[in-house]
Amino acid sequence: MANLKLISTSRPKGGETEKITINLGPIDLGQIDLLVEEGFYSNRTDLIRTAIRNQLAVHAQVVTETVTRRAMVLGLQHFSRQDLEAAQTANERLDIHVLGLASIAADVPPELAAATIASVVVLGAFHASPAVKAALAGRIR
């Protein structure tokens, strides 16, 4: 049985969310506004988040199986300067595979990231300094 590494599945708070933009037709938008006016939802965002969570729940088994098959970290994974220095000392190159949020500490120099990170695959959000992202540009998928 494959190992599934759960880091954190807690929902992000406030500033930890990513903004997306969607295009809706006027009829769909009108129906959303009607449901908000009638008190079913507190606002448009509440309805959209609820709908997305419901769809994710429908497909939860597929997500779990795929995360296991792809050997991905589910949740949050953070790499500190010390983590990357330890990998460098051990002559290891990291393949980062995350469904959720992957982040590299702000104090990580681009040279260290380039020397220790072989690839980055993130389904979700990837936070790193612009210099680190530039150093890893050819390795981010």
Region roles according to the model:
Residues 2-4, 10-12, 30-31, 42-66:
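Short, basic amphipathic alpha-helical segments that act as recognition/interaction helices
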Residues 1-27, 36:
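Short Lys/Arg-rich basic patches
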Residues 89-95, 109:
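Mid-chain, well-packed structural core segment of small domains
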Residues 117, 125-141:
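Leucine-rich solenoid repeat scaffolds
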Residues 57-90:
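Short, positively charged interaction helices/loops
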Residues 108-111, 133-134:
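Short, solvent-exposed loop/turn at the beta-strand->alpha-helix junction
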